[in-house]
Amino acid sequence: GVRLVGSEMCIRDRYIPYAGELGLLLPLGISFYTFQSMGYVMDVYREIVEPEKNFLKVALFVSFFPQIIQGPIAIYDKLAGQLYEGHSLRLENLQKGALLVLWGVMKKLVIADRAVNIINFVMDKPMDFSGTYVFFAAVVYALQLYADFSGGIDIVRGIAEMFGITMSTNFNHPYFSRSLTEYWHRWHMTLGDWCRNYIFYPLSISKRFLNFGKWLKPRFGAHISKVLPGCIASVITFIVIGVWHGANMKYLYFGLWNGIVIMLAELFAPVNKKVAGGFFKLTGLREKGIFATIVSVLWTFMLILVGYYFDIAANASTAFHMLFKSVTDFHISELGINNIILNLGACGLDEYDILLLIICTLLWFFISFVEENKKLDMRDFILSRKLPLRWAIIYLGIFIVIIFGYYGPGVNPADFVYMQF
């Protein structure tokens, strides 16, 4: 698995930057296309699935049109059967699929394409801004990336659903996670599943890693011997995930940061549990109460944000300087709405755009919060309303896109972020 991924990344990063100069035609979404192909080949090799003898059926699985540009990455035995059987057009599928497409378009055009102006403006010369605005740009990037990527996936899944095809969920409200491990089970879930199945598990249960665990037990105890081999496999997996994003040291640091933080959390889990237990006993707070949840979610978001500094910066050195500046030159008073408009007004957004961005983001997270806590599918909720209210909500969504979408003359449309992979 690791060798195949390495080969794909080598080809992509070595030759794709020069594709235009060489006059080469390259397939859209080469990484997603390659990952699905590799997954199928490895499943056949492991005898998890039967080899498909019909080349056209395999080609359909690999190149199913909605997903090929930016995923989600499908597992053969979960998707292939749906593609090979007949589907009749059903009103329920058309309605639910169209609602998901509309929701994705709203996130992309109203939030992501507007927010990217702030990010580009600050990241063009990040050292010219105070640490406050570097941090603010990183927060905006976290929101923009989520809106852009999840919006694109919603459009893909919605189109497939209209044809009666159910594709894997790729996001599950990741910014409500209480730990970095939980975040990676909620973010880009199909990539996470792929890496666990074809990189992490083969490494962690390999003979070398199992023998390493046996060697550790008499020297460092049961906990370390049980956890450390898996932690090392996890770090290697995150390095692969990081480098998959590009042949740049900043992506290596991105992978290392996530892998090492998760490794430390696992290694020190018993200590953390005792400390947390003592704190809750002393204060009388509940471990899963509102206060503990808010603190855990905010702390996790800050850990996520540190990783994003390496993603957003031009290079690793700039990322470290940005992190240092965010800590040493941060002034909360600069985050007032008037100061934001004054300092970031040249990014191409006016006061109306910034206020609209804030309001729409808050509305988006309110809906996500309701879905998360009530275990509610908003599409089912809308379609269960009486006809007048149902269509009022749908038309409201359409009008929001038409009126508040960031497009038109003078606007440079932003590609989906993950199209570059």
Where are these regions (language model features)?
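A short, hydrophobic C-terminal helix/tail in secreted or cell-surface proteins
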Residues: 2-4
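Membrane-embedded transmembrane alpha-helical bundles that form the catalytic cores
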Residues: 7-8, 12-420
